[in-house]
Each structure stands twice: as structure tokens, then as C-alpha cells.
A protein has these predicted regions:
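N-terminal Rossmann-like NAD(P)+-binding subdomain of aldehyde/semialdehyde dehydrogenases
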Residues: 1-99, 472, 476, 481
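Structural signal for hydrophobic packing residues in well-ordered secondary-structure cores
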Residues: 34-37, 41, 52, 75-82, ...
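Conserved residues at the C-terminal ends of beta-strands
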Residues: 111, 169, 187, 238, ...
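Rossmann-like NAD(P) dinucleotide-binding subdomain of oxidoreductase/dehydrogenase enzymes
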Residues: 88-230, 353
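ALDH superfamily catalytic-core signature
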Residues: 191-333, 396, 468-481
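Residue-level signal for inorganic ion chemistry
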Residues: 26, 71, 132, 163, ...
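Residues at or immediately preceding the N-termini of alpha-helices
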Residues: 4, 23, 41, 225-229, ...
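Conserved C-terminal structural/oligomerization subdomain of aldehyde/semialdehyde dehydrogenase
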Residues: 13, 22-25, 324-482
Length: 482
């Protein structure tokens, strides 16, 4: 970290040179990212296995493949994203034009999380590069193999005058936060998000905070056994099959009517074994918990006797191998930690309700989540979920898939996050849209200049009310002020 300030100043100066604004530079850096992913795919999967115990197919599905898609999407849309957009002016603005011109913010900081160490590092970087910024990436120290690959190999594919990867723990993060940035993009916990936001206040630095929360899944009385089976499969893969539930958009808990709860639970028991095997610890289909601290946190969530009594499936833990079995609970106490804190692991509480409609009030009694998942064929209930709840995203009849949609913004609301990214939304979050107006010297709004009189006031009134007929009548002397 010696010479950090001088290195960062050099990157600021490089941005001021204007080189990163060129479309060819942006394309070359995006292609460099793509080459990194293609040529180090095996190393990426190996690092994800070492850090989190992810199966290589899961690693490809959730990180390698997602990033490949995102970069290709950015390369395809880049020139259009960079182009200015015309803005419509009132008709009275003769011989005038206006446009929105996107320009890079400047020098940005990206601080990523450990659960998807490549995806959550490079996805925002795609947007920052596409927008023409210089940047520093600080990957999470809790995924050391992945962070090492990013720090030691990624720079060989990119312009090191514009992109720098800095490894380290909280002390390094704190030192970086003391610097002046044009934007800070952070993915992680709400606790650290508050620290980021507090540090940003010093320089009035804008922030994007991708946080999390307790994402609910509402299961309605679906119309057929097929629909029920599809629902269960999608719930299980979204909860236990995505980094063992260590994902900000993973299902945190399920809401279901009492009369359907037993049907749901029994089918889940069967499908867990089919999907993850009789012994998931041996089949390598469920990722490991990232470290001992998080393992003990999950263990403590089950320590309460009332919570233990609500376990209907699973519950076993292997501290040596940081493995937690997929676990289902039915109606744990609502004031227990497992129902008040984000779980971030393979523990799935099911809360039973008298009516599925009660789920709306239940969800609204808690902070706005990053995502809500509703499995239902009832159009009226869908409309109510859409109009009466608030969340970063709302998905009907599936879960987590919204993360892969480049056409949709990804981000939270309230305590689940600030800002959005993915696709063009990533470009936008690292851009400033400059408002540009052009006027001719040939015409003017002469009635905007003193000295004042009632005639000018009439013209101003007509102008601000878009009353072009009234303006004509004033000019012709056919309309006077009352």
C-alpha cells in the first residue's frame, strides 16, 4: 500500500487525459475482460471451489456464464449507450435544441462481496468501463483464492493506468474510503453499507449500495400437482443451490397457507434428496459456508430450543468442513433471530398463514426487501402483490432469475440498497447525463427582459401554460390582462 495516494493521483490524471472516453478504449477493455474470463475459466472455477466449495457447473452458471453474457451485451450496446439522446423543447423555443450527453463520472471505487467474488467484482466493472471511468477494485478478503486471481491475473488483460485491483482487509478498505472518489459502488451487508455511506459524506461522494435483507417467497394454492412440483424445484435451487443460500437475493423464508404447508413440506423433502442427493455433504451439490465465523452465526440461529423444535428436515452441521445441511423449519418464533436477521445460509423457515392474502401485511411489516417471489396463478393476487408491496424486484412463479436479465435493473429499495445496475443500468450508474441546450442568435424571447409591462406578463402567462393560441391572441392585441 506504499505510494497509494500517488498511484491514485496518477489514475485521476489518466482519466483527465481523456483516453478512457474513446469508444475504442472502452471496447478494448471489455474485450480484455472477456478474454480473462474465457482463458481463466478453469482457474476461476478452481478458486470458487477453494473459497466456497462451489461445484464447477454452479460456478459457471452463476459467475462465468453470467459475466460472459453481460460483457457481450455491453459490447453490443455500447455505441448506442454512448450516443446523445435528444430532449424535446416547447414549440415556443424556436431555433433551439436540447440533448442529454452521457459522460463518465471519473475515478470510481468498487468494493465487492465474497459470495460471488467474480460476478460481484466484474459486473459493476463492466458498467464502469463501458461508461469510460478509471477505477479501483477491492475484492473481498474472505474469498482469498478468487481475490488473488483478480489481483494477479486480471491486470494482465487490462489497461493498468485505468484499472487497479487492491487486496486487503478492513484496514485497506478504510484507507481507500479516506480517498476522494467520484463514486463508490459497494456490495455487501447493510452494516458495512452504513460505514461506506458515512465515509462518502466527507467528499459528498455518490454511492451505490447493493445490500440485501430478508427476501420472502409467497406460495399460493397452485392449480395442479405439476405447478406445485415446479414451484418446489425453483424454490430449492434458488435457496440451497445458489451458494448454499449465501446470496442477497436468495429466498429467506416462505409464506404459505396452513392447509397447504404439509403438502409443500413433504414434497420439498422428496425433491431435496433428488436434487442434492441423500447425503449432500458427499455429493458436492451444496456449497460450503465461507468461514468459521459465518458457520457459527448460522449455528447460533438454530440454538434456541423453540427454533430447534420447529426443524422438520435437516439441521445437521459439520464445522470441520463448514457444511450446513439444507434445513427446513415450520413456524419458528417470529421474534427469534432466524426471523429477524438475514439468514444468508441454507436454513429455510416456512411461516404459515390463515389466508395467503395475509402475506401482504406480513411483508409490509418488515423493511423493504431486495426481492419478493410469489408463486401463484391468481391474477387478482398478482395485482395486489404488485400494487401493495414494495421491493427491489418482484418475480412471479420463479426466483433469482431476475439477476440474469440485462434488460432489468438490479438493486434494492430502502434498507435493501441504493442504486441499480446490470446491462445499460450499469452504464447509467457510472455516467452523468449532461444537459446540453443550443440556441440561435436569430430569435429571442424578448418578453423575458425588463422593463416590465402587462403585455409581457400576458405573453409569459401564455408561454408557461403552453397556450400558443393565447400567445397569438396577445400578439394580435385580441387578449388583455383582466
Amino acid at each position: 500500500m506504499e505510494g497509494l495516494e500517488s498511484d491514485l493521483e496518477g489514475m485521476r490524471q489518466y482519466f483527465r487525459s481523456g483516453k478512457t472516453k474513446d469508444v475504442a478504449w472502452r471496447q478494448s477493455q471489455l474485450k480484455g475482460l472477456l478474454s480473462f474470463i474465457k482463458e481463466t475459466e478453469r482457474d476461476m472455477c478452481k478458486a470458487l471451489k477453494e473459497d466456497l466449495g462451489k461445484h464447477h457447473v454452479e460456478a459457471y452458471r452463476d459467475e462465468v456464464g453470467i459475466l460472459t453474457k453481460s460483457i457481450n451485451f455491453a459490447l453490443h450496446g455500447l455505441k448506442e449507450w454512448m450516443s446523445s439522446k435528444k430532449a424535446k423543447l416547447p414549440r415556443v423555443a424556436l431555433l433551439s435544441s436540447a440533448e442529454l450527453v452521457p459522460e463518465p463520472l471519473g475515478f470510481v471505487l468498487i468494493i465487492s462481496s465474497w459470495n460471488f467474488p467474480f460476478g460481484l467484482s466484474l459486473e459493476p466493472m463492466i458498467g464502469a468501463i463501458a461508461a469510460g471511468n478509471t477505477m479501483v477494485l477491492k475484492p473481498s478478503e474472505l474469498a482469498p483464492a478468487s481475490a488473488s486471481l483478480l489481483a494477479n491475473v486480471l491486470p494482465t488483460y487490462l489497461d493498468n493506468s485505468a484499472v487497479k485491483v487492491i487486496q486487503g482487509g478492513p484496514a485497506v478498505g478504510e484507507r481507500l474510503l479516506q480517498q476522494k472518489w467520484d463514486k463508490i459502488f459497494f456490495t455487501g451487508s447493510a452494516r458495512v453499507g452504513r460505514i461506506i455511506m458515512s465515509a462518502a459524506v466527507k467528499h459528498l461522494t455518490p454511492v451505490a449500495l447493493e445490500l440485501g435483507g430478508k427476501c420472502p417467497a409467497v406460495v399460493d394454492s397452485v392449480s395442479s400437482s405439476w405447478d406445485t412440483k415446479v414451484t418446489v424445484n425453483r424454490i430449492l435451487v434458488s435457496k440451497f443451490g445458489a451458494c448454499a443460500g449465501q446470496a442477497c437475493i436468495a429466498i429467506d423464508y416462505i409464506l404459505v397457507e396452513k392447509r397447504f404447508a404439509s403438502i409443500l413440506v413433504e414434497l420439498m423433502k422428496v425433491m431435496i434428496k433428488k436434487m442434492f442427493g441423500e447425503n449432500p455433504r458427499e455429493t458436492n451439490t451444496v456449497a460450503r459456508i465461507v468461514n468459521e465465523q459465518h458457520f457459527l452465526r448460522l449455528k447460533n440461529l438454530l440454538s434456541d430450543s423453540a427454533v430447534q423444535n420447529s426443524i422438520v428436515y435437516g439441521g445437521s452441521m459439520d464445522e470441520k468442513n463448514l457444511f450446513v445441511e439444507p434445513t427446513i423449519l415450520v413456524d419458528p418464533p417470529l421474534d427469534a433471530a432466524i426471523m429477524t436477521e438475514e439468514i444468508f445460509g441454507p436454513l429455510l423457515p416456512i411461516i404459515t398463514l390463515d389466508k395467503v392474502e395475509d402475506s401482504i401485511a406480513f411483508i409490509n411489516s418488515k423493511p423493504k426487501p431486495l426481492a419478493i417471489y410469489a408463486f401463484t396463478n391468481n391474477e387478482k393476487f398478482r395485482r395486489r402483490m404488485l400494487s401493495e408491496t414494495s421491493s427491489g424486484s418482484l418475480v412471479f412463479n420463479d426466483a433469482v432469475i431476475q439477476y440474469a436479465a440485462d434488460a432489468l435493473p438490479f438493486g434494492g429499495i430502502g434498507e435493501s440498497g441504493i442504486g441499480k445496475y446490470h446491462g445499460k443500468f450499469s452504464f447509467d450508474t457510472f455516467s452523468h447525463y449532461k444537459a446540453v441546450t443550443r440556441r440561435s442568435f436569430l430569435t429571442d424571447f424578448w418578453f423575458r427582459f425588463p422593463p416590465w409591462n402587462d403585455y409581457k406578463l400576458l405573453l409569459l402567462e401564455a408561454t408557461y401554460n403552453y397556450d400558443y393560441l393565447g400567445m397569438l391572441l396577445v400578439i394580435l392585441g385580441l387578449k388583455r390582462r383582466r
